[in-house]
């Protein structure tokens, strides 16, 4: 590793010999030097993904739950919508993990995991995420806004924001609730935090399933 760098330095300063053999090898030395410099200063971050989690209680699907449900793309603020994972998020500060990144943009990943969680909790219903390829029109929508999605300074994992559900064409009779969920991580590493965030996302699915069963009946169509 040091010899190409020495040739690279000598070539730039003009101290390298200009005999034919050295002249031919000079471009090779330059290329090797650049590769060596690039290889010493870069490393790819580890990639992490949220994962669906099973329901913690037996599921009884209310007859009022609409047959087809769409999980809208979650709202994620720019402070969280970044490639590198936010490791700590407190009231006045936020820090990212330089060696850890999400495997895909956070908003669509969260939407797909939430739709999978909700499908597990609503057997017999069809649940899909916004922008999924489907020709079935949704009869109800689940919307999530995220404001907090990381550890705090003490190590407790938070998922905060809001959850709302409503029938298609009837948003004024929808139901909404604030989200302020916490879970202890099983360790201090990034994997433990992502696992805790996955558990909290499953709790959001639990809440959405209950709210969908509490929606008022679909309005009767008007006949003119």
Predicted regions and their residues:
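Short secondary-structure boundary motifs at beta->alpha junctions and helix caps
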Residues: 93-101, 169-207
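Sec-exported extracytoplasmic/periplasmic mature domains
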Residues: 115-123, 209-217
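Soluble periplasmic/extracytoplasmic beta-strand elements of cell-envelope proteins
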Residues: 68-74, 86, 141-145, 158-164, ...
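C-terminal motif of bacterial Sec signal peptides marking the signal peptidase cleavage site
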Residues: 35-39
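A structural "domain/chain start" motif
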Residues: 40-106, 217-224
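N-terminal secretory signal peptides that target proteins for export/translocation
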Residues: 1-21
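Surface-exposed short loop/turn segments
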Residues: 41-58, 121-169
């Amino acid at each position: 590793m040091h010899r190409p760098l020495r040739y690279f330095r000598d070539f730039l300063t003009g101290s390298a010999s200009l005999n034919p053999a050295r002249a031919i090898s000079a471009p090779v030395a330059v290329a090797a030097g650049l590769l060596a410099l690039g290889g010493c200063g870069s490393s790819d971050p580890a990639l992490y993904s949220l994962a669906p989690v099973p329901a913690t209680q037996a599921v009884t699907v209310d007859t009022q739950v609409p047959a087809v449900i769409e999980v809208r793309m979650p709202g994620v603020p720019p402070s969280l919508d970044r490639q590198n994972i936010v490791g700590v998020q407190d009231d006045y500060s936020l820090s990212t993990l330089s060696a850890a990144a999400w495997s895909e943009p956070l908003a669509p990943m969260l939407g797909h995991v939430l739709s999978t969680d909700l499908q597990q909790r609503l057997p017999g219903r069809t649940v899909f995420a916004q922008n999924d390829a489907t020709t079935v029109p949704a009869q109800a929508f689940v919307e999530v806004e995220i404001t907090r999605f990381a550890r705090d300074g003490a190590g407790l994992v938070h998922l905060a924001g809001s959850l709302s559900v409503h029938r298609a064409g009837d948003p004024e009779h929808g139901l909404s609730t604030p989200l302020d969920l916490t879970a202890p991580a099983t360790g201090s590493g990034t994997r433990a935090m992502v696992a805790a965030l996955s558990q909290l996302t499953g709790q959001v699915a639990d809440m959405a399933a209950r709210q969908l069963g509490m929606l008022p009946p679909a309005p009767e169509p008007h006949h003119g």
